[in-house]
Amino acid sequence: MKSVNLKSTTKLMAVLAIAAFEVRGEEAIRTANPPERRRIVVSVPDRKLVLLEGDRVLRIYDVAVGKSSTPTPQGKFTIINRVPNPTYYASSGTVAPGTNNPLGSRWMGLSAKGYGIHGTNVPSSIGKAASHGCVRMRKQDLEELFEMVTVGTSVELQGEPSELLSKILSEAVSE
């Protein structure tokens, strides 16, 4: 049986504890004043997607949302992947990237499994409750948004407009 030097073990534990404290302290300093992060807020009833940086509006887009039989989930999620020219997979088969693809030219997957922000092969659906729960966008809008967000971007899907979002949307209408 190997003997353990209690004194050196205690010193090692103390050094590790101090190092852990210093790392946590440094992390707190680094994140005390984080840069304004971009976030997406979708008003499902208004069928609008707002891209914000802090409380500053960067863009407002018209979108399609889930129909009543397949509603858009509500809550706070994050973008977990970004896929240019996605392949659409369904029980009936796959659709390669292109004009017939129901996902359009871009896919931004959400932390709500199976849901995302994507394009459409039915542009007339924008502004309507027409999807299977995802948020659909016009091709040009989608491609612009895709370049402005990253994996980790916060996405809030609201079933009822918040005070902030109501104010933003009413100001956008009056401009």
Regions from the PLM with identified roles:
Residues 1-37, 165-175:
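N-terminal secretory targeting signals
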Residues 49-51, 72, 86-91, 118:
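Short, solvent-exposed loop/turn elements at domain surfaces
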Residues 55, 85, 161-164:
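Short, charged beta-turn/beta-strand-edge "cap" motif at the junction between a beta-strand
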